[in-house]
Amino acid sequence: MALKYPGGKEYRGNRLNAARQPMAADYANRGMTLEEDLNATNEYYRERGIAVVYKKPTPVQIVRVDYPKRSAAVIKEAYFRQASTTDYNGVYRGKYIDFEAKETKNKTAFPLKNFHAHQIRHMEQVMAHGGICFAILRFSVLNETYLLDAFHLIARWNEQEAGGRKSIPKREIEQYGHYIPLGYQPRIDYISVVEKVYFTV
C-alpha cells in the first residue's frame, strides 16, 4: 500500500524493518520494538489504574481500494490527512502527559532526523500549557532506553536548525536523560521515571 502526505509526497516511514535481527541483551524482550513494548506497558498501566495513556492513531484518507473478493479488500493508495503530532498522550496523577517514542541502531548518538519540525512545535505548545512532555529514546543495538525531557530535545533541535550538530550524543542523553530499565511487567516502566522527575520535590 502506498501512503502519501497531503502534498502527494510518498511516505517512506522510519520504522525498523519487521525482519530485523532480534536484540541480543534481554532474552524475554528480544525482538520487541519500542512501540510494542510501550503499548504493552500502557495496557498494564490502564488495567491497574496507574495511568491512562494511548498511542494516537495517524489520520489516513483512503483513496483507492481493490476488491478481489468481498471479504478481501486491499488498500492500494492512501494519504496522511495531516502531519501527526507525537506518538502517545494521556493522563497521570491529574497531569496531561505527551511524548514521542523513537529508536535508533546508532550506538553513540541519537539522530535528530528521526524527529520532525511539527512534532517539536507540538512539544513546545504542550509545555507552554503546563503539560508534561518528553521523548522516550531507545538505542536498539545496546537495548538501552531513556526518557529525555522535551526541554533538552527542543534545545538540541534549535541548535541543529541554526547549523549545529544533527544528533544528540549518547553521553548527553545519559547526563540529562533518565535510564529506564527493561522489565517484565511493565516492560518499560516510564511512569516510575515520570514520578521521580516531575512529581518528586
Swiss-Prot record:
Catalytic activity: Endonucleolytic cleavage at a junction such as a reciprocal single-stranded crossover between two homologous DNA duplexes (Holliday junction)
Signal sequence region: none
Keywords, alphabetical: Cytoplasm, DNA damage, DNA recombination, DNA repair, Endonuclease, Hydrolase, Magnesium, Metal-binding, Nuclease
Chain sites annotated for binding Mg(2+): 85, 87, 100, 119
Function: Endonuclease that resolves Holliday junction intermediates in genetic recombination. Cleaves mobile four-strand junctions by introducing symmetrical nicks in paired strands. Promotes annealing of linear ssDNA with homologous dsDNA. Required for DNA repair, homologous recombination and chromosome segregation.
Residues of the site described as Transition state stabilizer: 102
Gene Ontology CC, one term: cytoplasm
GO MF term set: endonuclease activity; magnesium ion binding; nucleic acid binding
EC number, as in UniProt: 3.1.21.10
Name the record gives this protein: Holliday junction resolvase RecU
Family membership: Belongs to the RecU family.
Record carries keyword Metal-binding: yes
Gene Ontology biological process terms, A to Z: chromosome segregation; DNA recombination; DNA repair
Cofactor binding note: Binds 1 Mg(2+) ion per subunit.
